[in-house]
Amino acid sequence: IPYELALGWRYTRAGRATRRNGFISFISGVSMLGIALGVAALIIVLSVMNGFQKEVRDRMLSVVSHIEIFAPGGAAMPDVQRTLQEARQHPQVVGAAPFVSAQALLARGEDMKGALVRGIDPVREPEVTDLVAGSQGEALAQLVPGEFRVVLGGELARMLGVRRGDVVTLIAPTGQVTPAGVVPRIKQMLVAGTFDSGHYEYDSTLVLLHHEDAQRIFRLEGPTGIRLKLRNLHEARSVALDLAGSLSGDLRIRDWTQQNRTWFAAVQLEKRMMFIILTLIV
């Protein structure tokens, strides 16, 4: 029997001999119970926080790609097809899709909200996102070039009071230059449906439309970037470094941890503080 176990067993059963030994046995039992409860609390709290982090991360990655490749300044990428081919050559890359990213205002009557506009390719989007499941996938399938249809985040649709079949006004900051100044470009868009990712930041701001329609509205010659999906999301940092050295052209690369750096840093800090506090209790 190990020495530690033999010693602990001796003191926990010491109450059979004398009253003094019984007191020692009581103190030993209380100490062991306190340590057991402290360790249990430490394990439970860290497990809950790890589960919370994983759940939020999974919901976030249903909208955010593992890696984004984009041109600086929000400009169109010089050679999208070439970059797609080069990115797919990496063994960790299992999906790639072009996108357009821009900011705009979305209006319905007197209500107006700021929005993050993302132009997507509905055919390739299933390679990099989980938004194509169920009715959300049916809505994305209606994003046909030239039809100027949009799919709104569920919370954004509720704030504007719109639903499928309604018309909203998209106001782009890029417009025509006139003697009176720059006139914003205004386009009427048909709501094809909504999506709910479970992440408020995206559900309240994100607008999806076909990337060719987005290029016309924002006067771009092509997509502004490419989104990638990896076999192992935890390899995103190393894959991004590999691609930075192999891709042609002046491009920027960021992985999913960099896109949400503030949130993940806050969660990690909270986990460390809880671990320290519970360790002191134990």
Model-derived features with residue positions:
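Feature of multi-pass inner-membrane transport and sensor proteins
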Residues: I1-S25, D250
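A structural signal for hydrophobic secondary-structure junctions
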Residues: Q81, Q85-E221
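Short amphipathic alpha-helical coupling elements at transmembrane boundaries
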Residues: A6, R10-A14, K54, D58-S65, ...
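Hydrophobic alpha-helical transmembrane segments of multi-pass inner-membrane transport and secretion
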Residues: N21-N50, Q268-V282
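Membrane-interface junctions
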Residues: A14, T18, G29-M32, Q89, ...
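Structural motif
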Residues: N50, I67, P91-A97, L160, ...
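Mechanotransmission and gating elements of multispan inner-membrane complexes involved in transport
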Residues: T174-G175, V182-M274
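Membrane-interface junction motifs in transport/secretion proteins
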Residues: Q53-L84
